[in-house]
């Protein structure tokens, strides 16, 4: 079992060409191994955030052994043996280990789809609040088309506000970057982390469907949960302290609030009856 995880390479036999061919193959395999090793260093220990070359060693006959971190002497990623439901629960609890597992040690390519779906949920909430504030029993087709375009408008506004929120976070981290003078910031990974950590917005639809007296409170709690998830995602992705992550969130909220104020002034200037920004939670 000790040799199951290693592969040997033999040079050609019987002539010089075989030896040369074997050396050439050895060099090629060595270069490939170095490339794979550098690529595999993208794994992270979920406990101490140190880089790791592998998560586990695969031996013969399906025998797996979890890699132990050289820094903290703990398993690099214990979640590879966990059920996805357990991982989701730990992510909901905003555990840093679960976030590191999802962001660094798994391949998830649903960031764009999740972002669009969350924006649709938020647009539906705004559209629902708009229709609730201006009820009309006129069955005219023009009224129905106007309501449909209101939904598209809410989707565009939600997209712009979320973009402003992300720009505020990125701008703060970019300005703060020379002060820290550390490794280069991976804004692509940070964007994916922020998109994934915004999954709490999916709870907007159940909150609207099962409407009750505590719906406004539920919407505020969902907002707090999303901000907390974004806060933890920034901490885990950039490996920064809580103070910087908190200031980054505040910067994003400041830019987003500026965008909301701009839309308020714009709607007031054109005389629109769209006043949902004054009473909505998102």
UniProtKB/Swiss-Prot annotation:
Biological processes, Gene Ontology terms: cholesterol metabolic process; intracellular sterol transport; regulation of cholesterol metabolic process; regulation of intracellular cholesterol transport; regulation of plasma membrane sterol distribution; sphingolipid metabolic process; sterol metabolic process
Keyword Cytoplasm: no
Comp. bias intervals (Basic and acidic residues): 18-28
InterPro entries: Arv1
Transmembrane segments: 155-175, 189-209, 244-264
Sequence segments annotated as region (Disordered): 1-31
Localization, UniProt: Endoplasmic reticulum membrane
Alphabetical keyword list: Cholesterol metabolism, Endoplasmic reticulum, Lipid metabolism, Lipid transport, Membrane, Steroid metabolism, Sterol metabolism, Transmembrane, Transmembrane helix, Transport
Coarse class of the protein's main subcellular location: endoplasmic reticulum
Membrane topology: Multi-pass membrane protein
GO cellular component, one term: cortical endoplasmic reticulum
Family: Belongs to the ARV1 family.
Cited function: Plays a role as a mediator in the endoplasmic reticulum (ER) cholesterol and bile acid homeostasis. Participates in sterol transport out of the ER and distribution into plasma membranes.
Protein name: Protein ARV1
Source organism per UniProt: Bos taurus (Bovine)
């Amino acid at each position: 079992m000790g040799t199951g995880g290693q592969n040997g390479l033999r040079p050609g036999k019987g002539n010089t060409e075989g030896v040369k061919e074997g050396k050439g193959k050895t060099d090629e395999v060595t270069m490939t191994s170095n490339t794979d090793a550098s690529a595999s260093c993208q794994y992270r220990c979920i406990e101490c955030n140190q880089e790791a070359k592998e998560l586990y060693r695969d031996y013969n006959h399906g025998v797996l052994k979890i890699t132990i971190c050289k820094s903290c002497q703990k398993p690099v990623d214990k979640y590879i043996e966990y059920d996805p439901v357990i991982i989701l629960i730990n992510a909901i609890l905003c555990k840093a280990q679960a976030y590191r597992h999802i962001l660094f040690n798994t391949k998830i390519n649903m960031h764009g789809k999740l972002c669009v779906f969350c924006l649709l949920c938020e647009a539906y909430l705004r559209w629902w609040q708009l229709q609730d504030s201006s009820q009309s029993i006129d069955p005219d087709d023009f009224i129905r088309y106007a309501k449909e375009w209101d939904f598209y408008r809410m989707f565009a506004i939600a997209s712009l506000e979320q973009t402003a929120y992300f720009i505020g976070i990125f701008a703060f981290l970019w300005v703060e970057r020379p002060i820290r003078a550390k490794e280069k910031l991976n804004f692509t990974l940070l964007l994916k982390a922020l998109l994934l950590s915004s999954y709490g917005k999916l709870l907007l639809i159940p909150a609207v469907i099962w409407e009750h007296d505590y719906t406004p409170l539920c919407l505020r709690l969902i907002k707090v949960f999303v901000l907390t998830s974004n806060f933890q995602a920034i901490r885990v992705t950039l490996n920064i302290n809580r103070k910087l992550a908190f200031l980054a969130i505040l910067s994003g909220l400041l830019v987003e609030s500026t965008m909301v104020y701009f839309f308020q002034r714009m709607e007031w200037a054109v005389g629109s009856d769209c006043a949902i920004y004054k009473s909505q939670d998102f």
